[in-house]
Amino acid sequence: MQQALEQALDRAEYIIESARQRPPKRKYLSSGRKSVFQKLYDLYIEECEKEPEIKKLRRNVNLLEKLVMQETLSCLVVNLYPGNEGYSLMLRGKNGSDSETIRLPYEEGELLEYLDAEELPPILVDLLEKSQVNIFHCGCVIAEIRDYRQSGNMKSPTYQSKHILLRPTMQALICDVHSITSDNHKWTQEDKLLLESQLILATAEPLCLDPSIAVTCTTNRLLYNKQKMNTRPMKRCFKRYSKSSLNRQQEVAHYSTPPQLRLVDYLQKRKGKKGAQQYDLKISKAGNCVDMWKQNPCYLTAPSEVDVEKYAKVESSIKPDDSQPTVWPAHEVKDDYVFECEVGNQLQKTKLTIFQSLGNPLYYGKIQTLKGDDESDSLLVPPQFLIGSKTDAERVVNQYHELVKSEAKCPVKMFHNSGGSINLSHLSPGKEMEPESISGSVQSSVLGKGVKHRPPPIKLPSSSGSSSSGNIFSPQQSSGHLKSPTPPPPPPTSKPPGLSRKQSMDLNQVSMLSPAAMSPASSSQRTTSTQVMANPAGLNFINVVGSVCGAQTLMSGSNPMLGCNTGAIAPAGINLSGILPSGGLVPSALPATMQSASQAGSPFGLKNASNLRPLNLLQGSDQGPSNQDQALSAQQAAVINLTGVGNFMQPQATAVAILAASNGYGSSSSTSSSSATSAAFRQPLKK
């Protein structure tokens, strides 16, 4: 279809150019008299055969003026006067003198609209029929427009003349039919229809019924060339500065302002009172002035030193929105926004992914282009970029939507697919898990240097110690996958004197262990998320959120594995329900029990009979002890904040300090140090 239309346009251009250069001659009947249209065509052929006096100019223009001058045809004269004098109509009498019949103001522009459309006004048909001179030519009227508005001398005004051919409208033809059939003869309805058809055939232009697109294209091109400056927007602009519009503006200016717009009236009067600012500018004649800036050469020397801090602009890093509290998500959040638009004949899709990784309060994003309907068409993994808070994420989606609409310049459809909470692991009751490797992103910072590296996978120990109730951690039950969802944070610039190295590990997923060996009937699906953050004081803050309903929560750090058995108290584990009373902490009970747990390197678990509860753990790094009294510096401290621990912990019991010495507990200083540490790291309860 597109190719056929282009061919039709080319054909139309060829036909117009051929008719302009070599118009074909027509054959007429010798008996009949030529109509005004035939006379115009013969004049057109005659002018085309003549050579133009000036090159690149055409002679086959202004044919109606030339025809009137050759045959002295009678015309309807329309005078356009300047100012508020309006316009008038004149008819020529038998003696050759023109008499003015109608004079109207420019506000009554109905007749002018008919003249602009080159149509015969029906209201003038009766007046023109009573004229002394026959003014009709094949049903048409030749009108001469005399424009006096451009004349500067009003005493002897001159005018610009232009001729137009006014064709009868259907309303004028109906009036002619009624005037003809209003005599004494009896006209039937069939006779009236036959008369109307003959009038239409006599006044209508030649009709081409060729079913070719080139005919329509040719007609449209000719009409466009004729009506270039006569479009509706151009008419609207012309009317804005017409005399009638200017008169209306002057009348409105003299009216008093209504009471509601007194301020506008005051501002207009104040604006009129202010005179234009006078500038005393004297322009010298050419050649009398000398441009001094052209005479004096300009030498610029490069400065030896540049104050960079004076001109440099410091861009602050992205900070989370303070209006929204920092939320540590317990699960991954992923939202996909697919933008679909049709550019040309191709469907383009772009996917914007906004996601929040496990244990990271910041939002990240990535953009990828989908080549087909399936989202798997994009094989390349797009790079992710930092967005910030949730408000920033919404702003990014809105800005990207506006960007796609502005570039596509067409309607854009947006599809939102919310991934919601993505469960990290699903275990059916009684199902054993296969051991998996744990990969971590470790950032080591030395004083003055920061090195990022990825260590080899760390295997979870299959078994650590034994208990009276049996080996509760079998290789099939130990499972966990730790990974870094976000890039590690940059190393700090300053460190305490006693701190030589700090390790921070981002743990993304930690699976729950199903106690199949203990009570297979009570196991269910478990989900746990862990986040480890670096503390400036050399402590690692671990945020654990998980469902600990009668099962074991596995936590991993630089210490030996910590675990707990739900049913028995043995050297292999610690039952927190027996350690923590309802009234508060029992610091004296920690060291003796923790000694056996540290020596055996056994896991330690947490029991909770309630539903999902968050858990915060603060873990200290190794530091060199200065003396034996400072037992905390030689040990690794872990503070667990159990928020809303349900059955076995009251709201006033805020924290429990578990001290696992790297060389074992045996001195009395360990007990006192553990009591002081547990009191020092107490945190308020989170509701």
Curated annotation (Swiss-Prot):
GO terms for cellular component: SAGA complex. InterPro entries: Spt20, Spt20-like_SEP. GO terms for molecular function: transcription coregulator activity. The keyword DNA-binding does not apply. Residues 423-502, 666-687 are annotated as: Disordered. Residues 485-495 have a biased composition (Pro residues). The keyword Nucleotide-binding does not apply. Keywords: Developmental protein, Gastrulation. One of its GO terms (biological process) is gastrulation. Residues 460-479, 667-680 have a biased composition (Low complexity). Required for MAP kinase p38 (MAPK11, MAPK12, MAPK13 and/or MAPK14) activation during gastrulation. PANTHER family: TRANSCRIPTION FACTOR SPT20 HOMOLOG. Belongs to the SPT20 family. This is Transcription factor SPT20 homolog. The lineage of its organism: Eukaryota, Metazoa, Chordata, Craniata, Vertebrata.
